[in-house]
Structures are given as structure tokens and as C-alpha cells.
Amino acid sequence: MVFTKSLLVLLWFLSCYTTTTSSALFNPPDNYLISCGSSQNITFQNRIFVPDSLHSSLVLKIGNSSVATSTTSNNSTNSIYQTARVFSSLASYRFKITSLGRHWIRLHFSPINNSTWNLTSASITVVTEDFVLLNNFSFNNFNGSYIFKEYTVNVTSEFLTLSFIPSNNSVVFVNAIEVVSVPDNLIPDQALALNPSTPFSGLSLLAFETVYRLNMGGPLLTSQNDTLGRQWDNDAEYLHVNSSVLVVTANPSSIKYSPSVTQETAPNMVYATADTMGDANVASPSFNVTWVLPVDPDFRYFVRVHFCDIVSQALNTLVFNLYVNDDLALGSLDLSTLTNGLKVPYFKDFISNGSVESSGVLTVSVGPDSQADITNATMNGLEVLKISNEAKSLSGVSSVKSLLPGGSGSKSKKKAVIIGSLVGAVTLILLIAVCCYCCLVASRKQRSTSPQEGGNGHPWLPLPLYGLSQTLTKSTASHKSATASCISLASTHLGRCFMFQEIMDATNKFDESSLLGVGGFGRVYKGTLEDGTKVAVKRGNPRSEQGMAEFRTEIEMLSKLRHRHLVSLIGYCDERSEMILVYEYMANGPLRSHLYGADLPPLSWKQRLEICIGAARGLHYLHTGASQSIIHRDVKTTNILLDENLVAKVADFGLSKTGPSLDQTHVSTAVKGSFGYLDPEYFRRQQLTEKSDVYSFGVVLMEVLCCRPALNPVLPREQVNIAEWAMAWQKKGLLDQIMDSNLTGKVNPASLKKFGETAEKCLAEYGVDRPSMGDVLWNLEYALQLEETSSALMEPDDNSTNHIPGIPMAPMEPFDNSMSIIDRGGVNSGTGTDDDAEDATTSAVFSQLVHPRGR
């Protein structure tokens, strides 16, 4: 980790630290600190927790409960986790509230060792009167010491009731509870929503869960360092590129609070440290510092960003931009102008619509403004809070009434059925009327508009200009073809020109039941042509600027590429201003569905190697087979498709970029790709080379081996990123410990060793240390040979080369990056040929789509 902090920051804090609680400005009217199951007061982080059985203002309503005490030795730093209250039936804590308004609800859980209860098997559901806080939370992947959950809810009555609901054949437990008043002005009722940028009101009616609270550049701050008892974590593990930042510090006592930003907003220790742009030797001034935060994609998020200019020596010298999920949240931000000084805190709130983030990742970035004299950007703190959904839940879609057994929801069941029936009948009548009207309007439009007229306003031209002649042709596959004509370029390999009516018939008028996927450019449907051929139809969305750009890029790439391991194209349709590409249908879909997330039989080790080899051949052809290399930029398991014989093809060229020419070493370009697969050097320098694809392919290799996503936010933090996690095991020589359990005892150790070495080389931090795709292909084929040959005969030692007798390849040392790979056995290395084109149509393909926000 390239930080200038570590010991210096710790020494700095020790030299200037004073306990902030001594100068607390806010005294919470309600301040319940409850130690559940304890028989005496417990001191934790300089705060006193009172036993739940002795608190005078607390009413504990329980059915069957008991106390669990840890059988391990007592640890004073985690003393509240030595006991727990265990419930086998519905139970509740009732708190008397003296001051209405927002309150923190903090829950502490630790499945302590106990001879009576197996708390690791507990399933926890916690609700208030109005909101679901936790729903069937389990400890299946738990390997830490405790779990801490923090919520804020607006209490509008004299009492706050927390109900704990065990699931069937399980128990629920809790170690400690905090219910603490929140300052009235800490969370506003309105914030700016992004994409589209509009005010979002009504926050006071919603509940929040703290997902992240980060101290940029500084150490962990516990409740002892915060006047409101909050915890601020160090941000290092969420930086997309650790070496992209330089930490700057100031004396906490020099921070100048204002009436609008007080000690309650954030401690001065947060504003006294900052991450700034490090000297990363970037080629582009648009380089950003980015934090990647795994989130639940089904919720909105309240994002608060904290700033304080402790960097500048003079006013108006630091101007930068803030981005949330690639949306410009703040442009040309000059902190000294906004605060009328230096070292004056400032914060801004936003609402991010997480429901469109299918990747489950929220990103926050800062970068220099294009007009700034100094290339720099900074951030001091970041808070991300999950917002309750329409069901008033922070965990799933179930409401409180549906979770409480025998609650008020069941009492009004008959009434709800009657009302629902009436509403349904009225809705059905209105729906029929609307459908009739829409059909009438559509019929009139179809009669009044000819297909030829629709062609006059094409927003796109699916005809790459490669100096080839254009010829007008008609589709002859249907009798409907005589009604229209369209432009076709057979010589550009765009294939057959389809009539729009043919597409409509093939997809049953784009029936939603035929939907295969959704992407930034539009949708992909499964269809069947008149001759019975199954196809995948990609229909572009003309309102999506990103989609149109990716759509054109894919057309341009596919028109000049033909290879057995690249997606092939049947034809297109540009009638009626449509943007439609037609591919042959890929029977076995994306590689990812065969690894996890789908109920499919596990792939054997040999099958996995053959699939990786096929994908490597496709990428090697992209890099070396065309007149100018092509960089895919979005290599991942959803973009590797499998035909009925599990032959792999690389798909989705929407982000592809022509590589550097012979006199160039790289292409400077804005960073695009998918988090988890993105080359850190490309992200840091914005210099794109073929080695960026190699890095992404290394992630794919680890994904194939371990059968888990590239990013998995539900795992412990050190396991979230598969590249970092798997590399740690590979360097210890223990890669077999984390591979898919279906492969245990079924993999030749020599083959696994070569596979791991190949992936490790691909995931090198710097591109110069990574192999070419040709070298990767060579080594994967070697791993396959080792799998097919006796381990005793083929066991490689540390000094072995990658020469395999019997394979027609030029002998070379493994990963010799000084060599230019021109030809390999079994790899088509020339430019696209008719033979290649014929080969490319032997298996069915379609381009797997992912949501563009995940890129």
C-alpha cells in the first residue's frame, strides 16, 4: 500500500489528540446503552452499558428467552460481546422516548461460543413499529468477532419498540442495543438526487442504515473520538487504486467550524486528514481518485461527502469535480470560495438511485477540473446510508405487518381482499380501454407511414466506411419483403438485411417473455426465423447516447472481424430508424451462469481449461490478427459465451478500442470497463494497451477456478475482490484451498500450478510485467496438456520452460514479453477471411448484456 501515512499519521494523532467527548456540544435527551443478558454494568469504549434487566425506563417483553454467556476468556475491549439475550419466540424491547425525532438504533451481534446455544445458526429479524431493520440475517459467511449495525429512524410516539423475530426452528439473539437521540439538523429533509438531477424530499419520513462512514487518509475513529458516538473507518481498502492518493494532514485544532458545519457534522479529526491526488505520472489531467463501495443494488442511498481544504496555501487554487456513479455531482468545486477561507469544513448531500446499479457497486470519485491551474482534488470523509424502500424496509421487500405473526395485518385480511377485488376490477376495465385506444392509434400510424419514409431520419448509419461499395438489396426470406427495401453491405460482412416486420415476427413483437438481457444500448430478445433458426436480436435504444456509441462500435468491429472464437453476426435492420443487430442464438449462454448463480451442472476442470483457451484465442486474434490491434476493454465472464458444444466465444464489443499503432506504446483514453475486472494501471494512467485485457482475463481465470464473482460485497472485506484474495493464496502456494469444491481431488496438481502461475502473471500490477495473450494461450494449452498427461511425467519444476513436445509452436520461455506473437498453433492470426467467416457461423451466439452503470 503506497501511503505516506501509517506510522506518521499515528504519531501525529498521538501528539495532537484530545478526547473530543470532553467538549461535547450535544447532550442526547435519550441515551440508552443496554448490555443484553449481563448482570452488571459494562464499560465499553468509555461508555457505560446497563443490563437490560435493570434499566428503569426499559420494558422487556419476552416469551421464551435465556441468557448466553461466552465460554471463552473475557476480553475487556469487547466486553459487551461476552453475554447475549437469546429468544426462541417473539420478543421486544420497549424504550420510553423523552424527545421525539430521529434516533440512532445500534445493534451489536456476536455469535459467542456457548455450550447451550449454537448462535452461528441463528436467523435474525428485527423490526420497529414501522420499519424492517433486519430480515433473516444469518451468520453463514461470518468469520469475524462481531457485527455492528447502525440505523436512524424518526420516532413520532412516546415509545419505541424493537421486536426480535426468530425464524422457524431457529433462535434470535442480541448482545447490546443503543438507542440515542440524533441532533435535529444532522439529516435534512431534502437532498439532490442524481441522474436525473432533481430535489428529493421527504427524507424525514424514511429510515436509514449506515453502510459506510469513512475517514479519508486517517485511522479508525471509534465512539471515543466522536461526540455522537459514531465510528469512522479508514478508507484504504475501498480505494480502487491505492497508489493513486497522497495523504495530507493538519492539526485538528486548526479546523475552523462554522454555524452550518459543527462538531456534530463530523469530528475535527476527519477534516484534519485528506486523500489528495498522488503523483501517479498520469497521462491525462482527467485522472480521478475513486472509491469503490459494494452495495445492495435494490435500494437508494444517501451520500454525504465531507471536504476541508487543508491542502492549499492560498485561496482559489484548488478547483476540482465530484462524481457519484460517473454522474457529475459537483463541478468546478472551489472550497475556499464556498467557505471564505482555508481549513473550513464543508459537506454536500446527494441521493443515488442504486436500483439501476445492477453491478452492486457505488463509486465516488474526485478529479481535477479541466479549467483548473493546479491538477489536484481532495476528500476528507464519506458517509453512505441505505434508504428504506416502499415497503418501509432496509432488508428485502417484506413489510413489518407481513413479518409479525398474528399482527394487525391478519386482522384486516378480509377487508383487504374485498378492497383489492374492487380495485382490481376497476383497474382491469381501465386497462382494457387503454389497450383498445393504443391499438387504434398504432393502426392509424402504420397506415399513414410507409417504411421508406421511416428511413429518411435514421439516427445512425450501420455502414462502416471502409471504402467498400454500397448496394441496395432486398430480403427474400419472406413474402413481406416486397413491401420495403434497405441498405446492405454484403462485402462488409454485416450479413443479411432484415425487414422490421421479420424482426417483429421472429420475436413475437418483442415479447417480454423472450427477453434475454438489458444493456445501456437497449435489449436483447430471443427469436425464431421463418426457417426455424433461433436468433438473438439486439434492439438499440435511440435515446441512450452511450448505447448508440457502443452499438456503432460493435457494428464497426464485427464488420471487419471473423474468427471461430469471436461472436458472429447474421444481419441487421435499420428500417423505421431502428438499430437492430441479429446474432445466432448461443445455446449455453454466458460462462458466468455455469460457474455460479444458476442451477447448472458444474464444469469439469478440462472443460474449464478448454473454455479459457477458446476465449484466449479470441482475444489473441483481436490483439494480433487484424491490421491494427483491437483492445476489448470489457473482458469478463458474462462476455464469454458458450455454444451447444461449450465452445467459447468473446462477445460484446461495445467498449472496444483500436490499439496503438507501431510507433505508439499506448492509447490515451477515458477509462471504461467493469469494476472488479478493470486494469489498475489503465485506471491510474489512462493509457490503454492490450495488457489491460490481459489483466481482466486474469480475473476471469480466478473466477473460473473459484466459482465466485469478481466482486462480492457480502463476503468479509478481505475477500470482496477476487483478484486480491486469490493472489494472496496463490503467493502462499495454497490456491487449491480456495478453488471450487466440485474440483477437489479432480485436478492434476501440475495443471493447477501452471494455471495459477498464468493467472498470477496476468494480474501483475504493471502491464510490462504481464504476458501477452499469446503467452497466456500457450500456458493454458500447456496446463491442458498436463491435465491430460500423467502428472508424474509432466510435473514442471521451477526452472522448466513452457515447451510441450507435439504441439506445433515456436519454443520460448514462459511470458517472454519481448517477443511479438505472430502465429500459434490452432490460432487464426491473419486478417479476417472467408474461411474464418464460415467458421464463425458454425455455432450460435448472442451478445450478453450488462447494465452500463456497472461499467
From Swiss-Prot:
Observed phenotype of the null mutant: No visible phenotype; due to redundancy with HERK1. Herk1 and the1 double mutants are stunted. In the1-4, shorter hypocotyls without brassinolide (BL) treatment. In the1-3, partially restored hypocotyl growth defect of prc1-8 and of other cellulose-deficient mutants.
Entry comment on modification after translation: Autophosphorylated.
Region spans: Disordered: 822-855
Tree of life domain: Eukaryota
Localisation: Cell membrane
Extracellular topology ranges: 23-415
Full protein name: Receptor-like protein kinase THESEUS 1
GO molecular function annotation: ATP binding; protein kinase activity; protein serine/threonine kinase activity
Additional free-text comment from the UniProt record: Semidominant suppressor of the cellulose-deficient mutant procuste1-1. This protein was called 'Theseus' after the Greek mythological figure Theseus, who slew the brigand Procustes.
Database matches in Pfam families: Malectin_like (PF12819), PK_Tyr_Ser-Thr (PF07714)
Biological role: Receptor-like protein kinase required for cell elongation during vegetative growth, mostly in a brassinosteroid-(BR-) independent manner. Mediates the response of growing plant cells to the perturbation of cellulose synthesis and may act as a cell-wall-integrity sensor. Controls ectopic-lignin accumulation in cellulose-deficient mutant backgrounds.
Signal peptide feature range: 1-22
Residues on Cytoplasmic side: 437-855
Residues at the catalytic site: D634
Membrane-related topology note: Single-pass type I membrane protein
Record field: transmembrane: 416-436
Induction record: By brassinosteroids (BR).
Entry keyword rRNA-binding: no
EC number: 2.7.11.-
Domain called Protein kinase: residue spans: 510-783
Tissue: Expressed in most vegetative tissues, including leaves, stems and roots, primarily in expanding cells and vascular tissue.
Family: Belongs to the protein kinase superfamily. Ser/Thr protein kinase family.
Keyword Cytoplasm on entry: no
